[in-house]
Regions:
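Solvent-exposed loop/turn segments at secondary-structure junctions
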Residues: 11-14, 38-41, 59, 73-74
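Periplasmic-binding protein-like
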Residues: 70-94
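Ligand-binding pocket segment of bilobal, Venus flytrap-like solute-binding proteins
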Residues: 1-34
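Extracellular/periplasmic bilobal clamshell ligand-binding domains
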Residues: 95-131
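Short glycine/proline-rich, acidic loop/turn segments that cap or connect secondary-structure elements
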Residues: 39-44, 85-104
Length: 131
C-alpha cells in the first residue's frame, strides 16, 4: 500500500538500505527516518528491548550466564550493530557509523512494567477500531 507515514523498527531501515534486492535499496531513497517525541518536554521515542534471564531451576546456570555475558559483551554488541542495525545495550560500546548517521534521539523512559500494565486496555482499543 501507499501512505505518508509508517512506523517501523529502525533496524528494518538499515536492512532495506543494504538489501541485496535492488528494489528495496531504491525504496529507501524515498524514506526518512525520524524519532518521534523529541521536543524538550516530550517523552522520547519508544524503544524495544530484548530480555534474557536464567531459569531458577536451570541445570546449566553457568552456561546460561556465560551466554548472557557474551551477548552483552563488546564483541557481540558490535555484531548486533553491524549486522542487524541495533543500538548497543552495553554502554562501553559505541554505535556503528550507520546508526550514528541517523542522529541522536531521546528514548522514552517509561518503565516496561507500566507498558505491560496498559497492554490489555491498548489491545481493547486496537480491537475496537479494527487496526
Amino acid at each position: 500500500g501507499e501512505c505518508d507515514i509508517a512506523i517501523i523498527n529502525n533496524y528494518y531501515f538499515g536492512k532495506l538500505k543494504y538489501s541485496e534486492d535492488p528494489k528495496q535499496r531504491e525504496w529507501i531513497k524515498n524514506l526518512l527516518l525520524i524519532f518521534p517525541n523529541q521536543g524538550i518536554n516530550d517523552r522520547g521515542a519508544h524503544i524495544n528491548i530484548s530480555g534474557g534471564g536464567v531459569a531458577k531451576y536451570s541445570k546449566n546456570k553457568e552456561s546460561a550466564i556465560a551466554l548472557l555475558e557474551f551477548l552483552t559483551s563488546p564483541d557481540a554488541q558490535k555484531l548486533y550493530g553491524e549486522i542487524n542495525f541495533e543500538y548497543p545495550v552495553n554502554s562501553r560500546v559505541s554505535s556503528t557509523k550507520e546508526l550514528i548517521s541517523w542522529g541522536e534521539f531521546k528514548e522514552d523512559r517509561l518503565p516496561i512494567i507500566k507498558i505491560a500494565e496498559l497492554a490489555p486496555n491498548a489491545q481493547k482499543i486496537i480491537d475496537r477500531v479494527g487496526w
